[in-house]
Design a protein with these regions (language model features):
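Glycine-rich loop(s) and the adjacent beta-strand/alpha-helix scaffold that form part
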Residues: 201-257, 298, 317, 398, ...
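An anion/pyrophosphate-binding glycine-rich loop and adjacent beta-alpha core
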Residues: 230, 236-352, 418, 422-424
């Protein structure tokens, strides 16, 4: 955020009173609002940065996990939890993991009751497919557009319950004294009006921070760390920020070709591999046989991503800096039925997946870290909740595919239950906070608008994303991380003097994003430097082994004089049932796909 001194002239702003303010209109925010409405809380407002139903949830393709046992009746929530902990390299919060896995069979059936368009077996049951590093087929899906189907279902349910939404509003700051939250400040992206929301409870369901990298699966104006930065600025702690998931299969394209360039890094769903897709290097070798002969293409995402990065780095990459993903051994009808959106996307670009492979390379996809919360999704700031990708704790050092959508609906319910039990009417921002926090912040925003600074916003963001890819990417070491922090400081200086348009302009939105991204980027770099081991998605070439003494979570707190301080805490132990599942050591039978 621009720190230049504003004038003292008062800033006009609207005020809106609400008992519960939900920031984020994706699956997590929608499900929390539904739970509140079903429990009789009608004074709720859901805010979205885009039009109704247009959230990042719709970009989640492959599926949503739950131990239904459609094909594998021996599956269970305890085994699902064990797989999640193993994939997270045992630094997940076991309580949060079990909260999600225990709920998911019921949540999947509930979505079915609400009309979700699941893909189905021949006898009409909810179909489930393989996803990487899972012991059984537990990923329910709607073709390869599961997130879109999920959000449509939740939006329809919310509308049936008359849940109020407000579109095209961006929150820029929480109103917090560090002990409790009292509301939030933002602006209407259509007309430029500043708004103070007096809220008794605030729920951050604002996504993650994967777009702080220059190759990412998000749209450029989302997943820029809004939720984490807002919470951190409001006095909440962050956790596990060093763990960034690089999805193995983002599109690798000719970036000089205007038709292909916008697709660089965009997700090629894991469902392609779950349905039998195979990875080959430029020499025609199915290289996962060298890295993971048992699980092959369906090993953990961090394993597959590092394998692809190594193939590219050692000169066995394809023309556009990737490897080949090939599902052409499947019939065209099968691909069109099971992967309709992927098939259509590549058809539109002139590639027939049924006839030829596509080029893929790792891409930033998901931040396992986020805001530290308790078992109900509440932060250490009273009445401030964080759910979905904004929260930390469920995924540990690496995330199972299909668990992100599961987390959104499970913790939407959990947070909604807790809030409904104690909601106490609209908030009221104390006069002192309004004078010391709200009004100075609004003057800062006004001063940032129409500023004729020296640096273009797009150039500042591009530099930030480039340095994160170079210094905090798939492979890390101390020297590079320290250089990344130095470069980040220089970017921060440039961000203080940007050329910004009016409040309704895209450049103003992105300038606000820049402030959020700087917080998230610093936490990722500092956490990666602090964790002197390799674990899951965090790989240090100068500390390549996993250290049992580092089975701890890194927390990030705001320092009294600015910046952040780091501390570590040990991880809790799982329940007896989940520990038994861990001890049994269930393992995917990959060869069922051959």
């Amino acid at each position: 955020m621009d720190e230049r001194a504003p004038t003292d002239e008062p800033v006009e702003y609207a005020r809106e009173d609400v008992s519960v303010l939900v920031v984020g209109a994706g699956a997590a925010g929608a499900r929390a609002a539904i739970e509140l409405a079903e429990r009789g809380v009608d004074d709720v407002l859901v805010l979205g940065k885009r039009g109704h139903g247009d959230a990042h949830t719709t970009w989640a393709r492959g599926g949503i996990n739950g131990a239904l046992g459609t094909h594998d009746p021996e599956d269970s929530p305890a085994i699902h939890a064990a797989d999640t902990l193993n994939e997270g390299h045992l630094i997940n919060d076991p309580g949060k993991v079990e909260t999600v896995t225990a709920q998911m069979p019921e949540r999947l059936r509930e979505l079915d009751d609400w009309g979700m368009a699941y893909s189905r077996t021949d006898d009409g049951a909810i179909d489930q497919r393989f996803f990487g590093a899972q012991s059984f087929r537990r990923t329910a899906f709607a073709g390869d557009h599961t997130g879109e189907s999920l959000l449509n279902t939740l939006v329809d349910r919310a509308q049936a319950l008359s849940v109020p939404y407000r579109e095209n509003v961006m929150i820029t700051k929480l109103v917090s004294d560090g002990e409790a939250v009292h509301g939030a400040v933002g602006f209407d992206m259509d007309d430029g009006e500043f708004v103070l929301f007096n809220a008794g409870t605030v729920v951050l369901a604002a996504g993650g921070h994967a777009a702080i990298y220059n190759r990412h699966t998000s749209r450029d104006d989302e997943n820029n760390g809004d939720g984490a930065a807002l919470a951190f600025d409001g006095g909440a702690s962050l956790m596990d920020m060093e763990f960034m998931q690089f999805h193995p299969t983002g599109m690798a394209v000719d970036e000089a070709d205007p038709e292909w360039a916008p697709w660089s890094g965009r997700l090629v769903t894991e469902a392609v591999r779950g349905e039998g897709g195979r990875l080959f290097n430029a020499e025609g070798e199915r290289f996962m046989e060298r890295y993971s002969p048992d699980q092959m293409e369906l090993d953990a995402r961090d394993v597959v991503a590092r394998a692809i990065a190594r193939e590219i780095g050692e000169g066995r990459g394809t023309e556009h800096g990737g490897v080949y993903l090939d599902i052409s051994h499947r019939d065209a009808d099968f691909i069109e039925e099971r992967l309709p959106r992927m098939y259509e996307r590549f058809q539109d670009l002139g590639v027939d997946m049924a006839e030829e492979p596509v080029e893929v390379a790792p891409t930033s996809h998901y931040g396992m870290g986020g805001v530290a919360v308790d078992d109900h999704g509440e932060t250490d700031v009273d009445d401030l909740f964080a759910i979905g990708e904004t929260m930390a704790g469920v995924h540990g050092a690496n995330r199972l595919g299909g668990n992100s959508l599961a987390e959104t609906v499970a913790y939407g319910v959990v947070a909604g239950e807790r809030i409904a039990d104690r909601v106490d009417g609209p908030g009221e921002v104390p006069d002192a906070l309004r004078e010391e926090t709200v009004e100075p912040h609004l003057r800062d925003l006004r001063a940032m608008a129409d500023n004729d600074g020296a640096n273009e916003v797009d150039a500042v963001l591009a530099d930030l994303r480039e340095l994160m890819w170079e210094h905090a990417g798939i492979l890390r070491d101390e020297s590079s991380l320290r250089e990344g922090l130095d470069r980040l400081a220089a970017v921060r200086d440039r961000a203080a003097d940007m050329r910004v348009g009016p409040v309704t302009s895209e450049s103003f939105e992105l300038a606000v994003d820049a402030g959020f991204m700087l917080v998230a980027a610093e936490a990722v770099l500092r956490g990666a430097l602090e964790r002197e081991e390799s674990r899951g998605a965090h790989y240090r070439t100068d500390h390549p082994d996993t250290d049992p003494d580092w089975r701890r979570n890194v927390y990030f707190d705001a320092a009294d004089v600015g910046g952040m301080t780091l501390r570590t805490e040990p991880v809790d132990q799982p329940s007896d049932a989940v520990q038994a599942a861990l001890d049994e050591g269930h393992e995917l039978d990959y060869h069922q796909l051959e």
